UniProtKB/Swiss-Prot annotation:
GTP binds at residues 56-59. This is Nucleotide-binding protein ASA_0318. It comes from Aeromonas salmonicida (strain A449). The lineage of its organism: Bacteria, Pseudomonadati, Pseudomonadota, Gammaproteobacteria, Aeromonadales. It comes from the Bacteria. ATP binds at residues 8-15.
Length: 288
């Protein structure tokens, strides 16, 4: 049976995630007390082959060690194919979402301000965040974008296979929080300053032809490829479900896009399960 544990800070998109997983055929349980997870698995494994469970900050064990031990037990005992998704967003975004929805934060009963509750929740959920197979930052995602991203991650994954995600981005918009590795391409030649190349992206032939003619660019790609190829077997043996590689340039339109596309193509040729995302291009904004 496949099991996905959904967690994250309140307001970050857990409810949307659970709704998408239900549409994908998962039997979903919202806000399950963590200590009931082993019993739930036993009770439903003969009826369902896909289970998704949402864990809320209100239903955590008192001890963080107990939480880590319980999840490790479920992950390692072999009854389920275990994956965990952690959803998050910037504090300012969470504050804005709560202001718009006028909902109470789950920790508001502790007589904390909203800002204090959000920060306290961060500490309480740290064990789930640090051990998640996939972290998704929803700060700049619409509900539709988040739904499509979850579908891509879930449907694009084969059983017990590591998914390698290449993600281009612009440093001017911030580093993606879901990245396991981040590479900075801002020192490389920038097509933005070449008038005839500026309107294009790293997916277009004129930019690709220019960047592929730059020795530093190609050496940078080769060295990233060699590093990942060296360590991916170790990550696979460690039962990782996802590895997200962030490639950043100034605005996320030219260099980072080209490099992410080149790396994705190289690892597809090696038979890896590869997904690609261009954060700036996906917003459809003309940044460089």
């Amino acid at each position: 049976m496949q099991l996905i544990v959904v967690s994250g800070r309140s307001g970050s998109g857990k409810t949307v995630a659970l709704r998408v997983l239900e549409d994908l055929g998962y039997y979903c349980v919202d806000n399950l007390p963590v200590n009931l997870l082993p019993q739930l698995i036993v009770s439903v494994e003969s009826q369902y082959d896909k289970l998704a469970v949402s864990i809320d900050v209100r239903n955590l064990p008192v001890s963080a060690d107990k939480l880590e031990t319980l999840l490790a037990q479920v992950r390692n005992e072999g009854r389920v194919e275990f994956s965990s998704f952690f959803f998050d967003a910037e504090n300012s975004t969470l504050l804005k979402r709560y202001g718009e929805s006028r909902r109470l934060h789950p920790l508001s009963r502790k007589q904390l301000s909203l800002d204090e509750a959000i920060r306290e929740e961060t500490n309480l959920l740290a064990p789930l965040s640090s051990t998640a197979d996939l972290r998704i930052d929803t700060t700049s995602l619409s509900i539709h974008d988040l739904s499509e991203l979850i579908k891509t991650r879930v449907l694009g994954k084969k059983e017990n296979e590591l998914v390698l995600v290449f993600e281009s981005f612009g440093f001017k918009y911030g580093i993606p929080k879901d990245a396991d590795f981040v590479f900075d391409a801002r020192f490389l030649p920038n097509p933005h300053w070449i008038p005839e190349l500026k309107p294009f992206t790293g997916k277009d032939e004129p930019v690709a032809r220019y960047l592929s003619s730059q020795p530093d660019v190609m050496q940078f790609i080769l060295q990233i490829e060699n590093m990942l190829a060296t360590w991916l077997p170790h990550l696979e043996r460690n039962n990782r479900s996802y590895v997200t590689v962030g490639i950043g340039c100034t605005g996320g339109q030219h260099r980072s896009v080209f490099i992410a596309e080149q790396l994705a193509g190289a690892f597809r040729l090696l038979g890896k399960n590869v997904q690609i995302r261009h954060r700036t291009l996906d917003k459809s904004t003309p940044q460089h």
